[in-house]
């Protein structure tokens, strides 16, 4: 027997799934170009010897999720890395940002608890993992082509 409440909830759920026009807003969008950007970032990080093993990207996801960056506390960021997921504010980001965020995933693959501790106890600019990620980007950045050459 189905209660009136569950019928009402079911009807509201069905309406919520299909807004007017039949489209459902995606929580996060996957861009094929970003998957390629992760591979380019891995190639860059593989030239470094910060950790005993290279970064593993087989389970890394990258998503465009502008809604995440509207949350107070995250508004100043353009990218954010979780354990295996990189969230980006928009799809048109430089490879340096993807490399920076992938470096955080690499750090987490080797020092997850220490990373979490430092994140809670250290300011952003002086966090050793942020410093290391910025250094990784700088050390792997290609020199800009000089005009006329």
What is each model feature region?
Residues 2-3, 140-142:
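Pan-zinc metallopeptidase signature
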Residues 48-54, 77-84:
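Peri-catalytic and regulatory segments of divalent metal-dependent proteins
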Residues 1-67:
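A metal-dependent hydrolase signature that marks the N-terminal structural subdomain at the beginning
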Residues 96, 100-108:
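Active-site recognition of the HExxH zinc-binding catalytic motif
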Residues 78-98:
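Short pre-active-site segment immediately N-terminal to the catalytic Zn-binding motif
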Residues 143-149:
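Long, well-structured alpha-helical subdomains associated
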Residues 71-74, 82, 92, 107-135, ...:
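Post-HEXXH active-site segment of zinc metalloproteases
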